[in-house]
Swiss-Prot record:
It comes from Pongo abelii (Sumatran orangutan). Its main location: nucleus. Residues 831-919 are annotated as: HA2. This is ATP-dependent RNA helicase A. It is found in: Nucleus; Nucleus, Nucleoplasm; Nucleus, Nucleolus; Cytoplasm. Multifunctional ATP-dependent nucleic acid helicase that unwinds DNA and RNA in a 3' to 5' direction and that plays important roles in many processes, such as DNA replication, transcriptional activation, post-transcriptional RNA regulation, mRNA translation and RNA-mediated gene silencing. Requires a 3'-single-stranded tail as entry site for acid nuclei unwinding activities as well as the binding and hydrolyzing of any of the four ribo- or deoxyribo-nucleotide triphosphates (NTPs). The lineage of its organism: Eukaryota, Metazoa, Chordata, Craniata, Vertebrata. ATP binds at residues 411-419. The gene is DHX9. DRBM domains cooperate for the binding to nucleic acid but not for unwinding helicase activity. The helicase-associated domain-2 (HA2) region is essential for the duplex RNA unwinding helicase activity. The minimal transactivation region (MTAD) mediates interaction with the RNA polymerase II holoenzyme and stimulates transcriptional activation in a CREB-dependent manner. The oligonucleotide- or oligosaccharide-binding (OB-fold) and the repeated arginine and glycine-glycine (RGG) regions are dispensable for both RNA-binding and unwinding helicase activities. A motif (Nuclear localization signal (NLS2)) lies at residues 1155-1173.
Amino acid sequence: MGDVKNFLYAWCGKRKMTPSYEIRAVGNKNRQKFMCEVQVEGYNYTGMGNSTNKKDAQSNAARDFVNYLVRINEIKSEEVPAFGVASPPPLTDTPDTTANAEGDLPTTMGGPLPPHLALKAENNSEVGASGYGVPGPTWDRGANLKDYYSRKEEQEVQATLESEEVDLNAGLHGNWTLENAKARLNQYFQKEKIQGEYKYTQVGPDHNRSFIAEMTIYIKQLGRRIFAREHGSNKKLAAQSCALSLVRQLYHLGVVEAYSGLTKKKEGETVEPYKVNLSQDLEHQLQNIIQELNLEILPPPEDPSVPVALNIGKLAQFEPSQRQNQVGVVPWSPPQSNWNPWTSSNIDEGPLAFATPEQISMDLKNELMYQLEQDHDLQAILQERELLPVKKFESEILEAISQNSVVIIRGATGCGKTTQVPQFILDDFIQNDRAAECNIVVTQPRRISAVSVAERVAFERGEEPGKSCGYSVRFESILPRPHASIMFCTVGVLLRKLEAGIRGISHVIVDEIHERDINTDFLLVVLRDVVQAYPEVRIVLMSATIDTSMFCEYFFNCPIIEVYGRTYPVQEYFLEDCIQMTHFVPPPKDKKKKDKDDDGGEDDDANCNLICGDEYGPETRLSMSQLNEKETPFELIEALLKYIETLNVPGAVLVFLPGWNLIYTMQKHLEMNPHFGSHRYQILPLHSQIPREEQRKVFDPVPVGVTKVILSTNIAETSITINDVVYVIDSCKQKVKLFTAHNNMTNYATVWASKTNLEQRKGRAGRVRPGFCFHLCSRARFERLETHMTPEMFRTPLHEIALSIKLLRLGGIGQFLAKAIEPPPLDAVIEAEHTLRELDALDANDELTPLGRILAKLPIEPRFGKMMIMGCIFYVGDAICTIAAATCFPEPFINEGKRLGYIHRNFAGNRFSDHVALLSVFQAWDDARMGGEEAEIRFCEHKRLNMATLRMTWEAKVQLKEILINSGFPEDCLLTQVFTNTGPDNNLDVVISLLAFGVYPNVCYHKEKRKILTTEGRNALIHKSSVNCPFSSQDMKYPSPFFVFGEKIRTRAISAKGMTLVTPLQLLLFASKKVQSDGQIVLVDDWIKLQISHEAAACITGLRAAMEALVVEVTKQPAIISQLDPVNERMLNMIRQISRPSAAGINLMIGSTRYGDGPRPPKMARYDNGSGYRRGGSSYSGGGYGSGYSSGGYGSGGYGGSANSFRAGYGGVGGGYRGVSRGGFRGNSGGDYRGPSGGYRGSGGFQRGGGRGAYGTGYFGQGRGGGGY
C-alpha cells in the first residue's frame, strides 16, 4: 500500500510538485477513523481515503488520486505498482444525437382539461405553451448574479452591512424599501422606455386569498434579464414587494443608486418605556465581571439628544481562511474494488479488500444465474415484470444511457420506471461481466417512497433489503453491498453524502424531477457540473408526464425517452357533477360567531361555487352555492363514498387532503360514523409524519367486501404507487410554506393545487381498471388554476443551501446559485450571505469558519444550530436540541378546537411558554415510555398527544446530538436533565435566554387581550394554538409584557406562533441587535424602550460580546467546554443569574390566575384529576410535576385557584421567585448548576434517579448505523 504513496510522490517530484496531505480524525471516540485528503496543484480533484490508522488512510488517498491520473491518461495503469484495480474501459461519450428527443408527445399533456363528456375527443396541444418562463437563452442563466459577484470582489462594500435593518434588511440593499422602490422602478421604466407589466396570480381560498406578482425586465446596458416573483396579502402589496426585489437587484448590479432620501417609517404604535428593577447587588456583580473580562464600557452621553450605541464589536474573530479561487466540483470516481460508496470508506479487511474487479464480477454473475435457475418464485416475479409498460423500452433506455452522459426518461406514473430502470442497468452490467463497475444511487423526494420502492425492488429480486438493493433515509438505513448494488435515498441524504464526493457510483438517477423542491434543484446544479468535469458518469433524470423541455435544455439538449403507460382511462368529474350524482344537500351552516382572523368577508365575485353551467339542475346550483370554497366538504366526501358503494366496482379510494390536521379530523369523522366505522371499511391515513409501520398498511390488500379508504396529502401524487386504487376524491388543495424575506413572514397557506397536480392525482385512479376521479372544485375554479406550482427555491430562505455550497467547496454562493435551473433573485442570495456572516459562519473571505462547518452539518436552521452550541456551553444541550428538533415538526397536541385546553396548557407550568410546554411534554412522554409501548400509548391517549410526532422529535434530537458529539462536543454537556416548570429552575431560565437568541428577530410586546406588537410596533395577535392565548375577550396581564416567538403566520391577521415569555434583561442579552442609550432610556432595536441604568445595559451587552467570543473559541476546539478558565466560568454564571426572572424584578407566580376566564370547564376534570398518569404505583407526575398540575401551581380549584396554592406546595423557602437575587431556592449564587442535586432538585421533585442519564449514555454507546440526513 505504501508503494502507491511513494509512487505518487516520485511522479509529482519529476514535475516539480508536491502532493499535500490533510488528515483529520472522524467518527466518535468509540469508532475512531482517520480521513485523509490529498491534492496536487494544477489538478481540480481531491483524492480521498480513510482507515483506522493514519498511514493506511494516506495510502488509500494516494491510490484514489493515482486512479484519477490513470483515468485522465496522465499515467498508464501498468506503470502503477501493485495496482490490483484495472480501470474500466471508458464509456463512449458521443455528444447527444437527439434520438427520440421529442418523439411523439403523449396525449395526456398540459393544457386546460376539457369537459368530461368530450374528454376523449380533445387533444391537448399546449405542451410548449405552458413553458416555465426560462429567463432568456441559456447563456443568460444567472448572469446577473455572476456580474454582481465579480463587481463585488473589486469593491467590498462592507459599510452597508452594518446599517440599520429597516424592513429588517433594507440597509443591505441600498436602503430601498417597500415605500420607495416602486416609484424608483417607474422612473427607470420611463427613462429606458420599458413597458413594465406585473403578472398577478391568485393564491389560496377566498377567505385567505393572497397574490403573487411577477415581472421579468431586460436591462439593455448589461444585455440580460432580471426576474422577481413576490407574495403579498393583496395586489398592491404583492406589486410593491415585486418592485422592491427588482430595484434591489438593479442596485446590486450597479444600475440604480442607493436611496439617499429620508426613509419614511410608518409610525407603528409606540411602546411605553418599561422600568427594569435591577438590584444594586446584581449591578455591582455585573460591573466586576466586565472588569475581569477587560471590557471598556462607554460613559453615558453628555447630550441626551445624541444617544450612544452600547453594542461592543466582536471580541474574537475567526482567522480568515484562504479564499477558494477555483470553482469546485464534487469529486467523482468510478467504482473501485476496495471502496464502499455507501459508507464512503475504504475496504481494508475481508475478502473484498484484495479481490480484483474481474473476480467480483464473476462471483456476482454466477450468483445471479444460479438464483434465476433455482428460485421459482423469482421466475414468477420476472414474468410479472415483463408486463410493465417500461419493459418494451428496455433496450432503447440502455442504449441511450450508454451513449449519453445525461438521459431524461418521461413516463406516466405507474409505468414502472422507478423500480425497473435501475434494475435494467444493474442486470445489464452483471450479465456482461462488468458487475464491479456498477453502483446506482436513486433519489426520491420523500422518505416513504425511498423505503417502499427499495423494499419492492428487493422483493422483485428475491431478496431482503441489504443485498443488491438498500435504502438510506433520515433516521434509518439498510445499506446494500459495496458492488453491483442500487441504493434508494432521499435527496437530502444524497446531499449530505456529497461531502465525501460521488465516488464509486456509476449512475445517479434523480426521480420525480418535476417536483422542483429546493434540494432537487440544488442537486441538479451539482450534477450538471459533475457531468461537465467527468463525462463518464451517467445521470438519468426521471419525471412524470409533464413538460420536460426545460430540463432537456438545462442538460445540454440531452435525449428524452418517452415511456407510455398502460394506464386505463379515468373518467373525471367536478364539484357540480359530484353534487348532481349524489343529490347532495349541504348541512345547515353553523350559527356560531366566527373569529375575525379565521374568516374573511367572502368576495362573491371570486367564489367560483356560484358559477354553474346551465346543464345542471336548480337543486345542484343551490347546493353548490351554499358550499364555501374555503372549506373541505367532509359531508360531500361521505356522500361520494356511499355513491361509490352503489357502483359495485371494487377498488380502493384515495382521498387527497391538504395537511395532517384535515386528515386526522376526516379519519375521526368517518370512524365515528357507524357506516364507515364498521368492518366494511378500512380508513388509513398517509402522511410523511406518521410512523413507517402505519405508512406500510396502505399497500396491503384488503379482504373481499372491505373498502380501503386512504386519506393522503400530495405524498401519494407521484412518489408512491398504490396498486388497487380505482377512485380518487381530490380536494384540489395543498399546503405550502411561503416565506417573505423583507419582513421575515412565514405564510402557511392552504392553496389551490396546480393543473399539473390535478392531472397527476387523476392518473392514480387508472391502475388496475378504468377509474373515476372526483375533483372537489368547480369547473370555473379549475379554469383559473395555475399550470405549475412555484419552485421552492423562490419561496424559502437560502441560508441552509448556502452553507451546503460552502461545505461542498463549490465556490461562491452567488456564482453557484446563478447556475440553477431557475436562479433565485439576487437580493435573496445576498440576504443569505449576510445572515451567515452575522452568525460568524462565514469569514471575511466568505469561506466557512469552524462554526460554519458545524452548522453546515446540522440539518437545521443555522441560527438554531448556533443556539445548540451555546446550549452545550451551558450544559443544557439536550433541552436545546429537543426544542430545536421539535420546531421541525407540527405540535404534538391533538386539539379539536382552535385553542388549547387545560390538559395541554398545564405542560407550560407557570412559564407562559409554548417552548417550555413542548419540553415538558417531551420529558413526560420520555418518562412514560420507560414503562413500555403500552404505557406510552396510554399516556399519549390520556394527554391527547400525537405519539408519531413525539417519536420523530426524539429521532431528530438524537441525530442532532450525535452530530455535535461527532464534532467533538463532550457527551456530558448533552446529557438529559429534568426541568421543573412550576418552580424556580435556573437551567430552564438559561434555556429560555438561549431560545431568545435562536428565534431573533421575533420579539413582541403584549398590549391587551390577544393583541401584541412586533418589530417596529406593528400589530399582530397571539396565535390561537399558544398556551398564552386567552380563552375569551377578558384582558390579560402577564408578569412581563415581552415575548419571543417562533414564526409570524399570516392568515387574515398576522399572528405569532410558538411564544415564550422573556424578561427585558434576556432581550438585552440575547435578542437585540442595536442598543442605544441616552443616559435615561435604553432603546433596543429602535422600538423597545427600557428604563434601566446606562451602566447595567452596557455591561449586559458586553456579556453578549464575551459569550460570542467564547463560541468562537469553543467551535475551534469543542472539548474545552469541560475545562473553561475561571473568568469564562464566572461570565457564564453571571449570564445564568441575569436569566432569572427575579433578576429583572419579575415574579412569575403573579400569573397563576392568568387564565381567569370564569371557572374551569367541568369536562376537563376527567383528564387531570389527581396527579395524572400513573405507572406501577409511582405517578409520572410525582412530586414537583404532580403538585404543579393539581395541588400546586394552579390551585386545587383549577386555574382560578388561589395564588397562594404554589406556596402551599413549596412553602416559604425564600418566597419562591421573590427570593433574594442570589438565587432563592438554590442558596448561594454559585449553586450547583450542572449537578442533578442542587437546592431545589435535591428535594426529590420529579426525579427518576440515574435512569435517564444512564439511558442517554447507553444509547450513544451503541452508536447508530448509516443515518445520513
